[in-house]
């Protein structure tokens, strides 16, 4: 892979973390960080998202969306969720795994990519996180988050939500640069949201 990348004149890298990693591995090609993936929606969907996102905000309660393959998101079973925070979950989740979810997690099933933006638009934030750790990013999936552009991030932003991302993730620079969310070091920082 390194040889193939080294032969390229230009590389579209997912983000600035990936650019740094490739340079450390000897790639000297010109690199352009993409920044974020898109999330396709038509004008009607965008208008509906705008209506939803302004109508469902409640005081004294923070609703955080998390969508994706919940079976691989081990942190959802061990994290400590502040009492004024609700983790609203969508995605694939085996019944046995659902029983192990942390207090404060509420599962809503699986929705299509056309339906999910409307459900998460009712939330206050979207969480981009992975790994097995109770508080910090751990494991292979967590390490992957360091270099990956998460489609979750694009979904949440397209749904009108600010995002919550790990400070060392591939999305952290984008979130800071565009002031479109909160960058945290560990899950216990959710109490500051």
Please describe what each predicted stretch is:
Residues 2-31, 43, 169, 173-174:
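A short, active-site helix/loop in glycosyltransferases that binds the activated sugar's phosphate group
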Residues 9-10, 125, 162, 180:
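Well-ordered beta-strand positions
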Residues 13, 165-166, 184:
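Short beta-strand scaffold positions
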Residues 17-20, 71, 163, 170-171, ...:
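Alpha-helix capping/helix-boundary segments
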Residues 39-122:
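Conserved catalytic-core segment of nucleotide-activated headgroup transferases in glycan assembly
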Residues 114-159, 165-173:
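Nucleotide-sugar-dependent
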Residues 172-182:
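Acidic, glycine-centered active-site loop in nucleotide-sugar glycosyltransferases
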Residues 182-188:
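Conserved acidic donor-binding segment of nucleotide-sugar-dependent glycosyltransferases
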């Amino acid at each position: 892979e390194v040889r193939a990348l080294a032969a390229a004149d230009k590389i579209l890298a997912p983000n600035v973390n990936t650019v740094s990693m490739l340079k450390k591995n000897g790639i000297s090609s010109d690199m352009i960080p993409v920044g974020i993936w898109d999330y396709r929606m038509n004008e009607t969907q965008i208008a509906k998202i705008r209506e939803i996102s302004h109508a469902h905000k409640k005081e004294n309660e923070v609703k955080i969306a998390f969508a994706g393959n919940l079976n691989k998101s081990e942190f959802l079973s061990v994290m400590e969720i502040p009492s004024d925070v609700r983790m609203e979950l969508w995605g694939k989740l085996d019944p046995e795994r659902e029983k192990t979810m942390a207090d404060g997690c509420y599962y809503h099933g699986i929705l299509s990519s056309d339906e999910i933006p409307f459900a998460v638009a009712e939330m206050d934030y979207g969480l981009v996180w992975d790994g097995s750790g109770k508080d910090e990013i751990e494991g292979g999936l967590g390490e992957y988050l360091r270099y990956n552009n998460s489609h979750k991030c694009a979904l949440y932003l397209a749904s009108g939500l600010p995002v919550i991302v790990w400070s060392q993730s591939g999305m952290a620079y984008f979130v800071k640069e565009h002031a479109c969310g909160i960058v945290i070091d560990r899950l216990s920082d959710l109490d500051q949201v």
